[in-house]
From Swiss-Prot:
Enzyme class: transferase
Subunit-structure text: Homodimer.
Name of the protein in question: 2-isopropylmalate synthase
Gene Ontology molecular function: any one: manganese ion binding
Transferase among keywords: yes
Keyword Cell membrane among UniProt keywords: no
Role according to the record: Catalyzes the condensation of the acetyl group of acetyl-CoA with 3-methyl-2-oxobutanoate (2-ketoisovalerate) to form 3-carboxy-3-hydroxy-4-methylpentanoate (2-isopropylmalate).
Organism for this UniProt entry: Pseudoalteromonas atlantica (strain T6c / ATCC BAA-1087)
One GO biological process term: L-leucine biosynthetic process
Pyruvate carboxyltransferase domain sequence ranges: 5-267
Pathway(s) it belongs to: Amino-acid biosynthesis; L-leucine biosynthesis; L-leucine from 3-methyl-2-oxobutanoate: step 1/4
Length: 519
């Protein structure tokens, strides 16, 4: 049996299901390219049949990703599989992942079919997927609660039908490592054709056992792990990619297993997903948390200074955390910024140096010193700006204080027109938002969520505002970054407005295409 474990990342599919607002196509592509750079073997890009937006995102990722297999999810239905086949057809390498529930609970209450009928549906779906590709994955949804005899029968039938990967999900995170390891062991002992397919696992974290169950599965012969960056996902999340990858790397001598993950890319991939998904990483999170390599105990600090491995089983550098907190100032030149970004793991093609440097100088003039976390925040935010901004902030003034009615004046460029409005509110941000809504001339926007995070340390740290807005029945996410909280909040709302404008343009184009096709 091979000692190579494939890493199947489902951040863009299962992970996105945990978000309050969907990622934009541009954001999904950013994450996909980061996963490719990380060394992920298979990227599950989405569920193409679920919406036109998801279809376009999967197709865009399929076109751009060259060094990983791009995968689309489908139910065991022909229309789902056809949508996958069409969306993925532009990829160099692609996989169709189809699934059906197999536990008694699901078969009886959700599918309302007999076990024989479910097997037939699975076989037909796999054969239909074979019209598009030889790389077919089949999942037995809720395998963790499926009777072992029926699970063995389903796996054997799926492989005979043409599935090259069979996935065994612990869909509700119910099993313990002993139970889940026993399921995998039983499959290898009882399914006669199991050597003709890769056995995969997809573990949820409802009882905090997703990583442990994934680990025991590969010890019993599974050779693909489905996981997500930062462990994000439905309910309590999924197996954390960074945790399982570093377990296999750190304990390689004992486990004898390898992956293609480039561990030095873990930290920045984690940061990117955290930023784009608006899901902060807990400080004590293994591998990527802010405290993962911190030592406060005097005894521990003394030990680490004498020999790093006294209290560190891996180095921060091994996951891409650089300890050099070089302080940059407005006197630092472009070459210094470029060099520092190279040390942080960013390549020249990851950013526009002129644009980034202009933002850096403005920030340095305000703060005096700019730190690594500031620089990375600027790089991230500059990437989020649309190439063609329909809405631009030209002027902002806000006032508030004790015994003062909060007010704000905002001047926006809307297309070719400049509009200025003033409003009062319950606070300076509320006043600024009301002024912007007056500029728009309508009240179709509903603020669903407003979140403020500090990016850095001290009172002069950058403020990042993430705002979720409901517009025409859809949710849009925006991010703003500034040393001033009100400015950051306004930038976040303008980011949303540009996203809604782009969505309106796409909807208009689709209507025109439909009308043209009907003529």
């Amino acid at each position: 049996m091979s000692n190579q474990v494939k890493i199947f990342d489902t951040t863009l599919r299962d992970g996105e299901q945990a978000l309050a607002a969907s990622l934009s196509m541009k954001e999904k592509l950013q994450i996909a390219l980061a996963l490719e750079r990380l060394g992920v073997d298979i990227i599950e890009a989405g569920f193409p049949v679920s919406s036109p937006g998801d279809f376009r995102s999967v197709r865009s990722i399929a076109q751009e990703v060259k060094n990983a297999t791009v995968c689309g999810l489908s139910r065991a239905l022909e229309k789902d599989i056809d949508a996958c086949g069409e969306a993925l057809s532009v990829a160099d390498n692609f996989r169709i992942h189809t699934f059906i529930a197999t536990s008694d609970i699901h078969v009886a209450n959700k599918l309302r079919k007999s076990q024989d009928e479910v097997v037939e549906m699975a076989v037909n779906a796999i054969k239909h997927a074979g019209r598009y590709t030889d790389d077919i994955e089949f999942s037995c949804e809720d395998a963790g609660r499926t009777p072992i005899d029926y699970l063995c029968r389903m796996v054997e039938s799926a492989i005979n039908a043409g599935a090259t990967t069979v996935n065994i999900p612990d869909t509700v995170g119910y099993t313990t490592p002993t139970e889940f390891g026993g399921i995998i062991q039983n499959l290898f002992n009882r399914v006669p054709n199991i050597d003709k397919a890769t056995i995969s696992v997809h573990c949820h974290n409802d009882l905090g056992l997703a990583v442990a169950n994934s680990l025991v599965a590969v010890e019993y012969g599974a050779r693909q792990i489905e996981c997500t960056i930062n462990g994000i996902g439905e309910r309590a999340g999924n197996c954390s990619l960074e945790e399982i990858a570093m377990i296999l790397q750190t304990r390689q001598a004992m486990l004898g297993l390898n992956t293609n993950i480039r561990s030095h890319e873990i930290s920045r991939t984690s940061k990117l997903v955290s930023q784009l998904c608006n899901m902060p990483v807990q400080s004590n999170k293994a591998i990527v948390g802010a405290n993962a390599f911190s030592h406060s105990s005097g005894i521990h600090q003394d030990g680490v200074l004498k020999a790093q491995n006294t209290y560190e089983i891996m180095t921060p550098e091994s996951v891409g955390i650089n300890k050099n907190n070089l302080n940059l100032t407005s006197r630092s030149g472009r070459h210094v910024i470029k060099h520092r970004l190279e040390e942080l793991g960013y390549k020249a093609e990851d950013y526009d140096l002129d644009t980034l440097y202009a933002s850096f100088v403005k920030l340095a003039d305000k703060k005096g010193q700019v730190f690594d976390y500031d620089l990375e925040a600027l790089l991230f935010f500059d990437k989020q700006k649309p190439a063609d901004e329909h809405y631009k902030l030209l002027y902002l003034q806000a006032s508030s204080g004790k015994e003062i009615i909060p007010s704000a004046t905002v001047k926006l460029q809307v297309g070719e027109e400049e509009i200025i409005e003033s409003c009062t509110g319950n606070g300076p941000v509320d006043a600024a938002y009301k002024a912007i809504i007056k500029v728009l001339g309508h009240e179709q926007l509903e603020i669903v969520d407003f979140k403020l995070d500090s990016k850095g340390e001290g009172a002069d740290a950058l403020a990042q505002v993430s705002v979720i807005v409901e517009y025409n029945g859809r949710r849009f996410n925006g991010i703003g970054l500034a040393t001033d909280i009100v400015e950051s909040g306004v930038k976040a709302l303008i980011h949303v407005l540009n996203n809604t404008h782009l969505a309106d343009q796409i909807d208009h184009q689709k209507k025109q295409q439909t009308q043209t096709a009907g003529v």
